[in-house]
């Protein structure tokens, strides 16, 4: 395991540091966590995990992202990453697509992809040579040391503001990607996809009340998609559970509209005194 990543990981049971031992990670109190043969480490607490993405959903997302449709989003996310960053984590990383872009922008950094979905972590473990993949639940407490991260990514994923602040350095950066109201509007109308919450901005601000907004970009661009790509787009997220299956003459032009925002800890000035 990459040394920088191992030094940042903590036992999810007792919060002690971890060390490698015969293919597993162990803490001084004897808690042991296996590394799956697919490359990720399971740092769950034994509690029932939230329902993660299915194998089909992950395959759809991987195909869609690798086709380059969200390359502009990935580039914008990477643009908020300081080149000097040493450790980057993506919470709700999925396949590791955005983490890989961030690591390319910070040539000396190591990365941690955290997710609850094993099918996603199998891909995230191979997303970048400088990345490790960890199964962990953001709501159970991240298995990371206090103030260990230079950058934390959160792309279309659940947010735990208090935990984000705990694991981020005082001078660190949080980069959050959220959909705007027009995101995938054509598909929402035609296939009954879930609407973007009109109060999303207010809820986001409340969740991240320990952070100050330091930069943001709104992106809106057309996606010209084949019928198979429309099916992949519908099937790669939570809409897969709620929407009708796209038909053979699926819409070929869809609007993507997202906001990429960067935040800094609100108490960073006090920490620097």
Where are these regions (language model features)?
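Conserved SAM/SAH-binding beta-strand->alpha-helix loop
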Residues: 115-119
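Class I SAM-dependent methyltransferase Rossmann-like catalytic core
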Residues: 50-76
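Conserved class I S-adenosyl-L-methionine
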Residues: 84-94, 173-203
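A short glycine-rich, Lys/Arg-flanked "PGG" loop and its adjoining helix->strand segment in the class I
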Residues: 161-173
